[in-house]
Amino acid sequence: MHKFTGVNAKFQQPALRNLSPVVVEREREEFVGFFPQIVRDLTEDGIGHPEVGDAVARLKEVLQYNAPGGKCNRGLTVVAAYRELSGPGQKDAESLRCALAVGWCIELFQAFFLVADDIMDQSLTRRGQLCWYKKEGVGLDAINDSFLLESSVYRVLKKYCRQRPYYVHLLELFLQTAYQTELGQMLDLITAPVSKVDLSHFSEERYKAIVKYKTAFYSFYLPVAAAMYMVGIDSKEEHENAKAILLEMGEYFQIQDDYLDCFGDPALTGKVGTDIQDNKCSWLVVQCLQRVTPEQRQLLEDNYGRKEPEKVAKVKELYEAVGMRAAFQQYEESSYRRLQELIEKHSNRLPKEIFLGLAQKIYKRQK
């Protein structure tokens, strides 16, 4: 059992610690700078292979287009949490390389989901560039590319962690999280099929289930849980305590995402929102349904889930009319207070700063 050696020093997401901008940038550069090594690990041996060399060359292109370019919050969280939780005997260079590799496993995991999700949502841009499937010559071949990104996760885990006592824990964690995320995606798809608009399915309970499974497990619990296993924190109680905080944080994050999809600046978010056109069970439409008059509900029925720009505009006008901007601001304040209460209640033997740093990182974000 891990003795929690060295967990008293304060931890926050790299951008939030009281460090100089130079140090913050160095930590990010260290993580981003490890990516070429990940690409080499995954492609170097296969690129010249007489049988599969062409396919591995394609994998290299897929990796370089889809894995970098994001904020890297999930991957950076693994590394920062590992540094905070690890004892003196766990801070050697090789152990830190393992943490960097596991961080990149989560970024590859994210890329796998996003490539597939963009196809299903018929999205146009991602991280300020064309979605991979929209690139000339890619199209639906991107489905197989997403599979390659997923299998890359397990190849990296094997290379860096196979000899480590936590290897099986990480394998099971990634496999379970993939299943949970895919269940969440399925809930999302069957709740709001593109071909049929039925707002009666858009309940708060269903929305919370979609968010928990589709976003919260892999975006918040997975990075922290991975770091916990890597330092030997494997008790069910500690993981349940962390999960109670992190799943709530994931819900908060997704509600922000839904708000930014409609009201955010694409120049900041890097993507053009499509939730209204895609008939998504988003926080905005669920809350709007609780506020509308019968006439306004009919307007929503007639215009939600339609591709025409004028119909999308009518939904946005309705959101303004029923006060969704103010409703979100009120939610953001109350949810942040609730998160702080949960952290106080559940962080027990884990340092509160891990959770407070994550919460502060996403509070009032614009992208």
Swiss-Prot record:
PROSITE patterns: POLYPRENYL_SYNTHASE_1, POLYPRENYL_SYNTHASE_2. PANTHER family: FARNESYL PYROPHOSPHATE SYNTHASE, FARNESYL-PYROPHOSPHATE SYNTHETASE. Its EC number is 2.5.1.10, 2.5.1.1. Its cofactor is Mg(2+). It comes from Gallus gallus. Pathway: Isoprenoid biosynthesis; farnesyl diphosphate biosynthesis; farnesyl diphosphate from geranyl diphosphate and isopentenyl diphosphate: step 1/1; Isoprenoid biosynthesis; geranyl diphosphate biosynthesis; geranyl diphosphate from dimethylallyl diphosphate and isopentenyl diphosphate: step 1/1. Belongs to the FPP/GGPP synthase family. It catalyses: isopentenyl diphosphate + dimethylallyl diphosphate = (2E)-geranyl diphosphate + diphosphate; isopentenyl diphosphate + (2E)-geranyl diphosphate = (2E,6E)-farnesyl diphosphate + diphosphate. Isopentenyl diphosphate binds at K71, R74, Q110, R127. Pfam families: polyprenyl_synt. One of its GO terms (cellular component) is cytoplasm. It is found in: Cytoplasm. InterPro entries: FPS1-like, Isoprenoid_synthase_dom_sf, Polyprenyl_synt, Polyprenyl_synt_CS. This is Farnesyl pyrophosphate synthase.
